[in-house]
């Protein structure tokens, strides 16, 4: 916990960031580095349980420091890890903030597996219902990773984004295309 707190306190020493916070409001969603590099629901690329302890304890410590240093409204009192939410900007836009890192994300193996999840069923259902029921002119999806394919010489270049979860991405894109 102290390491995460120290990291956040160091970021806040940046005078340009201080000026930015003074002038503008923020809507935030964490990325993997708030926990550990290339993290997912049950672990992280650079998490070593023998040196760093239990992954769930580490996630909880990272979350606590995040919430101490980056104030956001509590979304679910029973699940502090639930950060996905939507924000309306009048009748012009509704921004849907996703969690593509911690809640349901599985390790990106077997990219074509039919049950692979980046955001999971609960968040997918929430997003689809929100998009369908929104009366805003613009519906914006804000999240941490690239949605569009990144191919180099026809080969998927980065599994650490929606490319690693092709079936779930297709399901979302199909929904958007069919509910325009």
Protein language model annotation of sequence segments:
Residues 1-180:
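Metal-dependent phosphoester/phosphodiester hydrolase catalytic core
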């Amino acid at each position: 916990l102290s390491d995460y707190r120290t990291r956040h306190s160091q970021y806040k020493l940046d005078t340009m960031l201080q000026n930015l916070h003074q002038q503008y409001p923020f809507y935030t969603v964490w990325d993997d580095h708030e926990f550990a590099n290339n993290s997912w629901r049950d672990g992280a690329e650079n998490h070593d349980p023998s040196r760093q302890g239990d992954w769930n304890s580490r996630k909880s410590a990272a979350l606590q420091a995040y919430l101490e240093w980056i104030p956001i409204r509590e979304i679910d009192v029973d699940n502090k890890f639930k950060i996905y939410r939507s924000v309306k900007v009048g009748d012009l836009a509704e921004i849907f903030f996703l969690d593509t890192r911690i809640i349901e994300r599985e390790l990106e193996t077997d990219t074509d597996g039919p049950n692979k999840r980046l955001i999971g069923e609960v968040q997918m259902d929430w997003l689809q219902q929100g998009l369908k029921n929104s009366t805003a002119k613009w519906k914006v999806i804000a999240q941490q990773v690239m949605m569009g394919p990144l191919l180099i010489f026809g080969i998927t270049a980065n599994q650490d984004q929606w490319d690693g979860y092709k079936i779930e991405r297709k399901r979302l894109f199909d929904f958007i295309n069919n509910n325009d």
